UniProtKB/Swiss-Prot annotation:
Alphabetical keyword list: Cell membrane, Disulfide bond, Immunity, Immunoglobulin domain, Membrane, Phosphoprotein, Receptor, Signal, Transmembrane, Transmembrane helix
InterPro entries from the UniProt entry: CD300_family_receptors, Ig-like_dom, Ig-like_dom_sf, Ig-like_fold, Ig_sub, Ig_V-set
Alphabetized GO MF terms: identical protein binding; transmembrane signaling receptor activity
Residues carrying Phosphotyrosine: 188
Organism: Homo sapiens (Human)
Protein name listed in UniProt: CMRF35-like molecule 7
UniProt site positions, description: Interaction with TYROBP: 158
UniProt xrefs under PANTHER family: CMRF35-LIKE MOLECULE 7 (PTHR11860:SF103), POLYMERIC-IMMUNOGLOBULIN RECEPTOR (PTHR11860)
Disulfide bonds: 36-104
Gene: CD300LB
SMART domains: IG
Residue ranges annotated for the Ig-like V-type domain, each copy included: 18-120
Keyword Cell membrane carried by entry: yes
Task of the protein: Acts as an activating immune receptor through its interaction with ITAM-bearing adapter TYROBP, and also independently by recruitment of GRB2.
Family listed: Belongs to the CD300 family.
Length: 201
């Protein structure tokens, strides 16, 4: 099915609207903070934090209410700074089994937005390093409200559609060439009559 360029670009641009650190690490019994940044326009949307390698089965641990009011559940808290377009997730009293893959996400009508964050918990007494800088290398699109399909949807569906769209545009431009103006028709003179007269004389 052919999609209008505006709709296609809107769909593809969604996966670049949020980014966070590729990984964070902290010591056992300590705490860690994850900051996820989003683009303008998503300030009043619900932000969430879920756990699990696969997002179609990941468990939502906490989420905002679309405001800047902080929320806390057990050892996890979340707060959205809409002015800076950053929401912060804090995990306290870390245990070894807290090490896992997590997701920063924004709930919206249609595909949710999100980015993967790997949490590493070092054994007690081990040295820890700071969180890596934000990256968009692991961005993905989530399908549904917390019911998300695999990110390969982006690679195998949307990218080919974009390529088909570009090919169609190039083909249309090639087929809509400006027709050349008709040239002047050559003038033919009838020399048969004078030639006949000359031969008769």
């Amino acid at each position: 099915m052919w999609l209008p360029p505006a709709l296609l670009l809107l769909s593809l641009s969604g996966c670049f609207s949020i980014q966070g650190p590729e990984s964070v690490r902290a010591p056992e019994q300590g705490s860690l903070t994850v900051q996820c940044h989003y683009k303008q326009g998503w300030e009043t949307y619900i932000k969430w934090w879920c756990r699990g390698v696969r997002w179609d089965t990941c468990k939502i641990l906490i989420e905002t209410r679309g405001s800047e009011q902080g929320e806390k559940s057990d050892r996890v808290s979340i707060k959205d700074n809409q002015k800076d377009r950053t929401f912060t997730v804090t995990m306290e009293g870390l245990r070894r089994d807290d090490a896992d893959v997590y997701w920063c996400g924004i709930e919206r009508r249609g595909p949710d937005l999100g980015t993967q964050v790997k949490v590493i918990v070092d054994p007690e007494g081990a040295a820890s390093t700071t969180a890596s800088s934000p990256t968009n290398s692991n961005m993905a699109v989530f399908i549904g409200s917390h019911k998300r399909n695999h990110y390969m949807l982006l690679v195998f569906v949307k990218v080919p559609i974009l390529l088909i769209l570009v090919t169609a545009i190039l083909w249309l431009k090639g087929s809509q060439r400006v027709p050349e103006e008709p040239g002047e028709q050559p003038i033919y003179m009838n020399f048969s009559e004078p030639l006949t007269k000359d031969m008769a004389t």
